[in-house]
Amino acid sequence: MSEFWVISAPGDKTPQQTYERLQKATMGSGQNLSNCYKFSIPELKVGTLDSLIGLTDDLGKLDTFCEGVCRKVASYMGEVLEDQKDKLSSNLSAGEGTLVNFMHRFQWNMAKYPTKQPIKSLTEILSKVVTQVDTDLRSKSQAYNNLKSSLQNMERKATGSLLLRNLSQIVKKDDFIDGSEYLRTVIVAVPVALFGEWEKNYESLADYVAPKSSRLLTQDEEYGLFATSIFKKVYEEFKYNCSRYKFFVREFNFNEQDSVVRQDQINKIASEKRKMLGPLLRWLKVNFSEVFTAWIHIKALRVFVESVLRYGLPVNFQAVVLDPPKKNRKRLRDVLNNLYCKLDSTGLTNVDAEDSVPGLSLGMQEYYPYVFYKVILDFESRSF
């Protein structure tokens, strides 16, 4: 798991000076609390402060929704990879590189999200991108899951318990009486623990059961399949009395073609599943990248909007990405709070999700004197 802090602080004389100040605070004097990378947000159309205030709630909801779609795509990719889930990490990328590299080198995508558009329009464009992926994921996953479920059901009947398993691949023509007007062969699944009861009672389960006709055809850990011969006219009586002893009559009429047809069906569905798997995995890889990069652009919009609302106009702030190791996070937080404590006019400095006292944070999960957003990359661990 990687945790990134996307923060912004007001520009000194220039944003570059702010960046250098942050670098010195996080990496200087031998502290090495965290790497510090520029988070490049272009100048966007500010509009009115009222419009920015109105956007904060929309962007917050979109942020949560987009992260959720990222996690759904990653989780489903792990599900599709099945016994190769250990390869999930290598399939999660952003653009041409890794998720970590994307965070370290974030650049606004001018082609997809032109900055001449108002922030509200950019928000709508990003929302449409993510919503479309979410919709497509539902339809594609449903189609693949239906095929996978059909194959699993057929394979279960071919390889599962003798109580449910398809008999066409177990019994042979010679196991059945063929062409008799009066007699028929009945296949009965008997629990292993009741074999003795079966041998003792099967001849008395109806009036016309052929003596000494019971034959064990096969067995597994739970059940044995017995064949016995009865008169056709007592079939229902025999079946009913079997159920009283917890013997299970398998409804089955032998057909030599059934086994071939069923195996052909399994092979056909397995082939369709394999053909669907490749394109589905490619779609998941491409669209995870699409949604993840959209998510970080949404973070950038949130940083920009909150920075303008906090630090005022003209726009003058520097956003950076920090990736502190867990052992350094508390120390880094203290350094940043000391560096920017003068910016706080709320009395809420140091209120965060871990340290806040219930009821005293005024409903705010995290608040710092600088703009702060967290990005946690734990898609692999959440998908297993």
From Swiss-Prot:
<comment type="similarity">
    <text>Belongs to the V-ATPase C subunit family.</text>
</comment>
<keyword id="KW-0813">Transport</keyword>
<dbReference type="GO" id="GO:0000221">
    <property type="term" value="C:vacuolar proton-transporting V-type ATPase, V1 domain"/>
</dbReference>
<protein>
    <recommendedName>
        <fullName>V-type proton ATPase subunit C 2</fullName>
    </recommendedName>
</protein>
<comment type="function">
    <text>Subunit of the V1 complex of vacuolar(H+)-ATPase (V-ATPase), a multisubunit enzyme composed of a peripheral complex (V1) that hydrolyzes ATP and a membrane integral complex (V0) that translocates protons. V-ATPase is responsible for acidifying and maintaining the pH of intracellular compartments and in some cell types, is targeted to the plasma membrane, where it is responsible for acidifying the extracellular environment. Subunit C is necessary for the assembly of the catalytic sector of the enzyme and is likely to have a specific function in its catalytic activity.</text>
</comment>
<dbReference type="GO" id="GO:0046961">
    <property type="term" value="F:proton-transporting ATPase activity, rotational mechanism"/>
</dbReference>
<dbReference type="InterPro" id="IPR036132">
    <property type="entry name" value="Vac_ATP_synth_c_sf"/>
</dbReference>
<keyword id="KW-0375">Hydrogen ion transport</keyword>
<dbReference type="GO" id="GO:0005765">
    <property type="term" value="C:lysosomal membrane"/>
</dbReference>
<dbReference type="Pfam" id="PF03223">
    <property type="entry name" value="V-ATPase_C"/>
</dbReference>
<dbReference type="InterPro" id="IPR004907">
    <property type="entry name" value="ATPase_V1-cplx_csu"/>
</dbReference>
<keyword id="KW-0406">Ion transport</keyword>
<comment type="subunit">
    <text>V-ATPase is a heteromultimeric enzyme made up of two complexes: the ATP-hydrolytic V1 complex and the proton translocation V0 complex. The V1 complex consists of three catalytic AB heterodimers that form a heterohexamer, three peripheral stalks each consisting of EG heterodimers, one central rotor including subunits D and F, and the regulatory subunits C and H. The proton translocation complex V0 consists of the proton transport subunit a, a ring of proteolipid subunits c9c'', rotary subunit d, subunits e and f, and the accessory subunits vah-19/Ac45 and vah-20/PRR.</text>
</comment>
